[in-house]
């Protein structure tokens, strides 16, 4: 006899799903540089950051843990590389800026909660769902969530730094399922990355919802994701859960 599916666990991405930076990275970096007497353009720093971040992520994935780095050192190297690419003559002299930026990005004042996030989390709690974070963030995430008033909504928080592997690696999702004592068939993940969040969670048998955000989805992604799995905003999650539970009977 078929029974209605009842979800038990929702895991969440954080950055650009529940929270976002108050100002673009380039603006934050350039502002701190100017405070130390170094004048650089926001857009130049933004472009340099993207290049430096990509290179660092490729050369030292997951904060370089397997190479003996700490996430703090990893980010410091990103900042110094960013300023070198932005044309700062003595980028090594920017070490105090790098240290300050690490602290600033640890502060809830650098971040803001996205519209609908808190209401949606409360709604999920009212349904009796377990909630957890599965994020490719570093060790600062717990403090940021606490400062923003969001930590209390989650049973536990998993970061790729703590677990030792980043999304879409299936091990981080399996760790969440194991901690929650939940089978993947009654768990779903919510995030804004097609590769890391949507495909990563589906690979272990979880359901998945893709947050579309402010930027339009790539047409190839949109064509490959059922429309009922796409959330134009977080306020669409609870109705999407209702539809999922109604349309996925369990034998």
UniProtKB/Swiss-Prot annotation:
GO terms for cellular component: mitochondrion; nucleolus. The modification N6-succinyllysine is found at residue 15. SUPFAM superfamilies: HAD-like. This is Haloacid dehalogenase-like hydrolase domain-containing protein 3. The keyword Acetylation applies. Belongs to the HAD-like hydrolase superfamily. Keywords: Acetylation. The keyword Acetylation applies. The modification N6-acetyllysine is found at residues 15, 130. InterPro entries: HAD-like_hydrolase_domain, HAD-like_sf, HAD-SF_hydro_IA, HAD-SF_hydro_IA_REG-2-like, HAD-SF_hydro_IA_REG-2-like_cap, HAD_sf.
